Each structure stands twice: as structure tokens, then as C-alpha cells.
Amino acid sequence: RGLAGRGSVQVPKDCQAGIYLKTLDLRDMVSGFSGIQYEKWITAGIVMPNFKVVIRYPANAFTGITWVMSFDAYNRITSSISTTASPAYTLSVPHWLLHHKNGTTSCDLDYGELCGHAMWFGATTFESPKLHFTCLTGNNKELAADWEFVVELYAEFEAAKSFLGKPNFIYSLDAFNGSLKFLTIPPLEYDLSATSAYKSVSLLLGQTLVDGTHKVYNFNNTLLSYYLGIGGIVKGKVHVCSPCTYGIVLRVVSEWNGVTNNWNQLFKYPGCYIEEDGSFAIEIRSPYHRTPLRLIDAQSASSFTSTLNFYAISGPIAPSGETAKMPVVVQIEEIALPDLSVPSFPNDYFLWVDFSSFTVDVEEYVIGSRFFDISSTTSTVALGDNPFAHMIACHGLHHGILDLKLMWDLEGEFGKSSGGVTITKLCGDKATGMDGASRVCALQNMGCETELYIGNYAGANPNTALSLYSRWLAIKLDKAKSMKMLRILCKPRGNFEFYGRTCFKV
């Protein structure tokens, strides 16, 4: 792989946790460098490169800084991290930890694996691959001056044979095999005190993340939300992100419903010490052999679930005068031998959208090759909240066939209503597109069924409304005000494919 592009990231001398540093556009890095690899890219047209990203900076074991390099190809987190960078966003997309104490770091970024589609040498409307640099754990010692590190991009651009590659996820009932990528827990912070302490990592791994008033859907949480609970052996790694002058001995145990009753029980419980390389493996403990992956709103995680508790059985210690807490970052890499409970919705329809409170009699809804962001000015729209909707939200593109079931309720007495529901399949747009099959259902039928092909001329469809030439559905209501509600359910048929791992804020 040859040098394809370069950039630089400026770092303030007082680099604190949560600050945003810079965003580098991969395409701009390559085109701006204008080297031989860019010429190859222009010749190839579309490519699925395996980038090697080298971040060059001098090692310093005294600052305690850890940065995050986050990869987002669909502009899902750009506006949310422009001032402060919450881990709810930076850790919800593919990311890599950059420890100041380690010095220059190399990361492999396989575009074909992460996005599942080819990359064009010029800007496109559906993707814009970027590297975001933010600070996860801040410095203990302020440096003498502001500085910068260099980011080098290495790649070999060979022509791709098709636009679509391997999907990131295929909908099926047995989708989870235990492997988890990019599942990083926000820093656990230990106080410097004489009292031994513990920090808990909740195993509510199917719960939707929350940032203030916003929900953040990411792939790992969505994948695990397909199941009610899970058991097995949690494998992962602990990164001690403090300066080298700090020290700690950690023991991890899995506990149900809170913490151990006394210190002796901690050593009697099955557990393990964190090895020098940070690795650990611990079986989930639960009276049900499984722990729930989500909770009811009023329930406390410490009372109804298993947790991984990281006990500081010795330390943390630091030189006199230090007051900053000791940050530790946990990454979960696998749940080996997963003991999965029943699916949340086994082989069933998902609620897509409800329409109600109609204010006009003649109503028409455009259902494009996408799933969400449906709106109306003449009725009330309520979108369903379910794993399938979340999976589409946390990907850039999707493709497959949906079986649709339409149902409605009437305002007046049954048998005395008139009007109907017309469903038409179309391609392109109303003015220049083509009309396909159409059917009319009387309101007194109370429902009907159809299907929708999700995709466009390129194959998979971006999460935008009719952004490319694609198939879509028009639902026209006659005498809409005589309906209380129109409900649309959907069920993915066969292998429904998702491309481009990312996240989504609502």
C-alpha cells in the first residue's frame, strides 16, 4: 500500500476529555495530496480500499491522554460532536483508541468491510467518509504549548467489480454469533482514596443509548435488542488510560442484583485479575443463567441485571499532589458460547407507522425505499419503535423485500362508510416515472396486504427519501376523515441486507 494522502490534527496543550479536535475527509485527503494513488483511483473509478491509517505522535506516558478516531461515512455524528464530543456518538460508530503513552499508532480501516459498497473518486450524495478525532480521557499534565500530530493514509486502489460488496448485517433469526466489534464502554473513573472501590459495567447491551433528550441508535445495541436476554462468557480488554505514575490492581467479577455483601465473598466469587495486556474473561452470573438485555423504564440496572464489577483491590495510587481520577476504559470483544433467550419478536411483523387525526378527506402518502422520516401536515404520524427500524437507522443503505400489512379503523358505524384505499407501485417520480401494479380496497374491508421492494438501480437504497431512481409506494385515501387510524406493519422477507455501519440520533 502506497501513501495516498495526509492530514494533521491540532491538539491544545490542555487537552481535556470530551473536546473535539478535528475532522479529516478521506476523499479530500487523497485528492488534495494528488499522488500516484489518486491517479490510480481516477482510473479505477470505484474501489473498496483497505486503508492503513498511521497517526504519528511522540509517546508521552505522563499525560494520560486517550483520543478516539471515529469513522463515519454518512455524516451521522458530524453535527453532534462539533463542540463537545459525547462518547454516545464517538463510540457508536467504528472507532479506534489512540493512547498518548504508546506513541505512533496504526489502524486498518477496511472500507469494503465497514461500508459494504464501493467508493467513487468524486463526491457523492449518499456518503462522505470522514475521520473524527476527539479526546476520551484528558491530560493530567498540561503541555508546554499547543501541538499537532500527523495522519497518513496508505492504500492501493484497484477497481471494484461491483458497487455492492458484503453486507454488514443480514436479517435472520440467528444473526448473533457472539462476536462484537467496536463495543467500548465510556471511561470508568476511580477516585484517589484509601477506600477500595468498584465500578460497574451494565450488561444492558440491548438498551438504546441516551444523550440528554436524544436517543442514539448504534449497531451493537440494536443487534442485541433482537433478544430478550443473554448468557455466556464475556471476553474483553481493559485499557488503563492514566499517567504512568498511577497504579491499580483490578479484579473483575460478574454479580447479580448489585454487589457482594462483604470483602471475603469477592474473592470467593468466580473472577479474574486483569492481566498485564488488559484481557479478561468472566461468565455472566444470574439465577436465570441469562441477564436481560433491556429493562422497563422504572427498573434499576443494579437491581434486575447482571453487571461486570471491576474492583480496585489495591490502589489506585499516585504521587503526592495528584488529584485527578484514574480513568479505565473497558472494551467487550465477545460473548463466548452465547446462551440466547427467545427473540424479542420471533418471525413476526414489526409496527412501521400509524396515521391518525386526518384533517382532509383526500390524503396521499409517499412510501419510498426507506423506512423512517415519514411526515405529514394533514395527519398525525407515529413511527414504530422496534429492532428492525433501529437497524435501518444505524446503517447507511439497505436492500430487500418487505411484506406489508395495512389495517384501519373507522369513525362511523361499520357498514355505513364509503371510500377506499388505493395502493400503487411506482418507479422514479410522479412526473416522469412509471406506474406499476395498483389495487383498490374498500374502507369496509378494514385492511389489505402488499409488498415493497426496497432498493434502487444501484441495488441498496440510502436512508433518504427518493434520493435515487428507485421503486416506491403511493397510498391514497378517499374519505380519510372517516378513518380513525391507518396502521402499516412490515415483515422482512428472506435475507434483508444492511450496508454501511453507522449510528443515528433522534
Swiss-Prot record:
Further information: Virions are comprised of 60 copies of the coat protein.
- Which GO terms of the molecular function aspect are on file? structural molecule activity
Per the record, the similarity remark reads: Belongs to the nepoviruses RNA2 polyprotein family.
| GO biological process terms held by the UniProt record | transport of virus in host, cell to cell
Please provide the record's keywords in A-Z order. Answer: Capsid protein, Host cell junction, Transport, Viral movement protein, Virion
Please identify the protein, giving its name as recorded.
RNA2 polyprotein
Q: Please, which domain of life does this record's source organism belong to?
A: Viruses
Relate the protein's function as given in its record: The movement protein is assembled into tubules that allow the transport of virions from cell to cell.
The record's account of how the chain is modified after translation: Specific enzymatic cleavages in vivo by the P1 encoded 3C-like protease yield mature proteins.
GO cellular component terms attached to this protein's record: host cell plasmodesma; viral capsid
